[in-house]
Amino acid sequence: LHQRGCNCAQAVACTFCKEFGISEDDMFRIAEGFGLGMGVMEMCGALSGMAMIIGLDNSQGGTEEGSRTKGDTYKKIRSKVEKFKEKNGSCICRELKGVETGKVLCSCPQCIADAVALTEEYLAEQGK
């Protein structure tokens, strides 16, 4: 998907559209603003895409139910982000890309692959 013009968040989130019954076009639009570390090279877009899918899967609420699953969702996302950081040395886009140091820690395609793998790991842990 990244080679087709998707940003990192879109490439991860759109990978799981069929599992959740969401059209790729809708997910593409939802995830668009999360690329390039939300446009300022902060939190890796691939991890933002992963967080979207974990939230989509784990949330049991709606606007009427409030926040009954938020804490659990945050915990699950935090666990996967920590695993990503352990492997790649950061979760910050500009650090991963070596913008200030000249040393690339992880390429965009590898960040996407790692985030997809962590999302698949999460889904397997949930029995999916």
Segments from the language model and where they lie:
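Acidic-glycine-rich active-site phosphate/pyrophosphate-binding loop
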Residues: 13-32, 87-93
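Short glycine/serine- and small hydrophobic-enriched flexible loop segments
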Residues: 14-18, 52-59, 117-121
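A short glycine/serine-rich beta->alpha loop
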Residues: 1-3, 33-42, 99-105
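Short cysteine clusters
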Residues: 8, 44, 93
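C-terminal binding/interaction regions
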Residues: 68-128
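Phosphate-handling active-site elements
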Residues: 19-29, 56-76
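Short, conserved "active-site rim" segments that organize catalytic pockets and cofactor/ligand binding
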Residues: 1-11, 19-22
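Conserved phosphate/anionic-ligand binding catalytic regions in large, soluble enzymes, centered on
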Residues: 38-52
